[in-house]
Amino acid sequence: MWLWEDQGGLLGPFSFLLLVLLLVTRSPVNACLLTGSLFVLLRVFSFEPVPSCRALQVLKPRDRISAIAHRGGSHDAPENTLAAIRQAAKNGATGVELDIEFTSDGIPVLMHDNTVDRTTDGTGRLCDLTFEQIRKLNPAANHRLRNDFPDEKIPTLREAVAECLNHNLTIFFDVKGHAHKATEALKKMYMEFPQLYNNSVVCSFLPEVIYKMRQTDRDVITALTHRPWSLSHTGDGKPRYDTFWKHFIFVMMDILLDWSMHNILWYLCGISAFLMQKDFVSPAYLKKWSAKGIQVVGWTVNTFDEKSYYESHLGSSYITDSMVEDCEPHF
């Protein structure tokens, strides 16, 4: 019955869909047939979520709110490095969020951007550089504390996993793209380090990445990441496009994406958590997802007041750029 519960199931979305199809087709029979067909397809191709008891052990270990260091804690140490992982553990983080990218020779490494310009002393697209070339770069070169981390290298995915497990940190693998390559690389990690099944989450803004991960391994805990208006606006709220019509089209796409994320895609992918931009998380929002058996993690929560609100009022886990002080968000 949970499927059709008013707050937690699919009754609302499919009732809305039926109404839209009635308006479009002007035929009750055709609208009902189309709605029913879409529901059957969703049921056939969707994945069952990982058992909630196991997901909770990962998302809220020891039934406590998790503080997750964004990119390893990009304010406290050079982002996506082994030093950041060690520093996050030292500063009391429950887990770390790490970004996966690939070199031109297919080696999975930790990197947020598709170029090395922002974080290192090199230039160029990551997909044009071999692992040997990127290994020579300094990932601390442009960090505010670069003098404290003189010997850092861009780590491989395997090196990062081993370091996290050594410090008993939960890992949030953030996948930006390359659905096939990323899921294959992660599957190898889960096979080599089976403890990851109880110590990690694969998350992405891209539903196809999460769906592919569930296809590859249904035992992996997954999460969708979302920021409303992300297609039409940048992280700091500025419009991405100058022309009215282009902006309007992407606003409409944002509305469709947001509706799909909250009403259909969570069920299709069988996720266990939803990573939401911090400003859109409220008690009512948490209640909505809780009715679906899904945990909400807010990002990026960077001030003492925000952290206190999440811990004391919301009772929700969060991702932060710093475990030790207030800082500006890192987009």
UniProtKB/Swiss-Prot annotation:
Its EC number is 3.1.4.44, 3.1.4.-. The keyword Hydrolase applies. Residues 65-331 form the GP-PDE domain. GO terms for cellular component: cytoplasmic vesicle membrane; membrane; plasma membrane. It is a multi-pass membrane protein. It is found in: Cell membrane; Cytoplasmic vesicle membrane. N-glycosylated. Inhibited by EDTA, calcium chloride, and zinc chloride. Enhanced by magnesium chloride. Glycerophosphodiester phosphodiesterase activity can be modulated by G-protein signaling pathways. Residues 1-3, 269-331 are cytoplasmic. PROSITE patterns: GP_PDE. Widely expressed. One of its GO terms (biological process) is lipid metabolic process. Keywords: Cell membrane, Cytoplasmic vesicle, Glycoprotein, Hydrolase, Lipid metabolism, Magnesium, Membrane, Metal-binding, Transmembrane, Transmembrane helix. Mg(2+) binds at E97, D99, D174. Its cofactor is Mg(2+). CDD domains: GDPD_GDE1. It comes from the Eukaryota. Interacts with PRAF2. Interacts with RGS16. This is Glycerophosphodiester phosphodiesterase 1. It comes from Homo sapiens (Human).
